[in-house]
């Protein structure tokens, strides 16, 4: 038995999140204390199968569909709760994804503390 974490969590995602990481994002998005931040994920994750065509080419495809709680197919990716510009911060002092996530967590924690004081 482990520890149950109920504090705010931010999961950073981009188009490089696919397959099992896409499934992880889906499961995390369903939790009330989690916000997904970034750009739409790369999708996939529906039990990938591989096969070889008669000409020798290899193909890989999802053998099943995966749906979110609303019934939407996630094969083409998951849209984050907080969508950021798809930008690379090469040479920048501050990574825009990390900065946005830190700001979100700070605001979120302050809201929680404010509600606790009122109780």
Spans of model-derived segments:
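C-terminal "post-core" interaction segments
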Residues: 1-119
């Amino acid at each position: 038995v482990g520890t149950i974490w109920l504090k705010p969590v931010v999961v950073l995602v981009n188009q490089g999140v696919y397959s099992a990481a896409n499934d992880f994002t889906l499961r995390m998005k369903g939790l009330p204390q989690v916000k997904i931040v970034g750009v739409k994920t790369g999708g996939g994750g529906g039990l990938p199968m591989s096969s070889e065509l008669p000409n020798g080419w290899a193909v890989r495809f999802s053998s099943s569909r995966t749906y979110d709680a609303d019934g939407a197919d996630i094969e083409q990716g998951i849209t984050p709760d907080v969508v950021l510009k798809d930008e690379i911060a090469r040479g920048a002092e501050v990574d825009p994804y990390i900065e946005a996530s830190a700001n979100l967590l700070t605001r979120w924690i302050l809201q929680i503390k404010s509600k606790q004081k009122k109780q």
